[in-house]
């Protein structure tokens, strides 16, 4: 989005090679106030408690939506891998929840059809985190509603949450693209500028909003004392 260089964008990629590619793309696109980290979600959650106002979780998944253009995705698929991915998504989402400020939003997305990784992941998350709810998104042409009844494997039973119908499925036969799923989650509370979970709340002065790059300088000072420099993307 257009944030007039007043925000701070932190992009995390757990695989070092992809993190370096991501760094190059951020630089090539001229994105201001942005940096790339190469950390586990658990490590980030330790130092960014209720820090972010927006979080995008582009979750690792079984890749069923890529079957048409990626033969490797077909060859690597298995029911067991779907379950492994679903468990990994649970952990990532829990970390995202702890890093989100009150009133903030999480956008969750996958490129798979697997219900366990889509409606299932959202249902499990909402049952673990009652402070969150699904935000209904206006559907564009070709978008379909999530299916609450698909939240569980055939052998499983559990609570069906009707608000899962407010999530979105993208089927390749209905639009020009591959298969995807997305949901928007909102955390209870009121989003406030200057919110600080572990300290005194400090408002943001108007003069500070006009200072280009102020946020990134403050973050880099913080990162030097907190994050492992060997895992910052681009480090030697």
Question: What role is predicted for each listed range?
Answer:
Residues 4, 100-102:
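Helix-to-beta-strand junctions that scaffold the AdoMet/dcAdoMet cofactor pocket
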Residues 17, 53-94, 111-118:
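Mobile active-site "lid"/loop adjacent to the S-adenosyl-L-methionine
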Residues 9, 22, 55, 104, ...:
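Residue-level signal for inorganic ion chemistry
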Residues 176-181, 186-236:
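Polybasic, low-complexity RNA-engagement segments
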Residues 2-8:
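Conserved S-adenosyl-L-methionine
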Residues 105-110:
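Conserved beta-strand signature within the Rossmann-like core of class I S-adenosyl-L-methionine
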Residues 80-83, 119-143, 149, 153:
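Conserved Class I S-adenosyl-L-methionine
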Residues 10-50:
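S-adenosyl-L-methionine
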């Amino acid at each position: 989005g257009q944030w007039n260089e007043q925000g701070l964008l932190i992009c995390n990629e757990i695989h070092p090679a992809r993190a370096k590619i991501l760094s190059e793309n951020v630089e090539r696109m001229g994105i201001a106030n942005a940096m790339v980290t190469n950390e586990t979600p658990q490590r980030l959650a330790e130092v960014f408690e209720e820090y972010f106002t927006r979080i995008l979780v582009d979750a690792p998944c079984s890749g069923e939506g890529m079957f048409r253009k990626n033969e490797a995705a077909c060859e690597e698929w298995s029911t067991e891998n779907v379950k492994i991915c679903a468990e990994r998504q649970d952990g990532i989402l829990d970390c995202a929840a702890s890093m989100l400020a009150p009133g903030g939003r999480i956008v969750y997305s996958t490129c798979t059809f697997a219900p366990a990784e889509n409606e299932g992941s959202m249902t499990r998350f909402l049952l673990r985190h009652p402070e969150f709810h699904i935000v209904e998104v206006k559907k564009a042409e070709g978008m379909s509603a999530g299916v609450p009844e698909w939240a569980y494997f055939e052998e499983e039973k559990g609570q069906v949450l009707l608000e899962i119908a407010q999530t979105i499925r993208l089927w390749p036969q209905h639009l020009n693209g591959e298969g995807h799923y997305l949901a928007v989650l909102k955390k209870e509370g009121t989003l406030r500028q200057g919110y600080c979970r572990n300290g005194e709340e400090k408002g943001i002065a108007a003069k500070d909003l006009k200072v280009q790059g102020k946020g990134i300088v403050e973050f880099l000072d913080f990162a030097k004392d907190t994050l492992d420099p060997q895992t910052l993307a681009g480090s030697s």
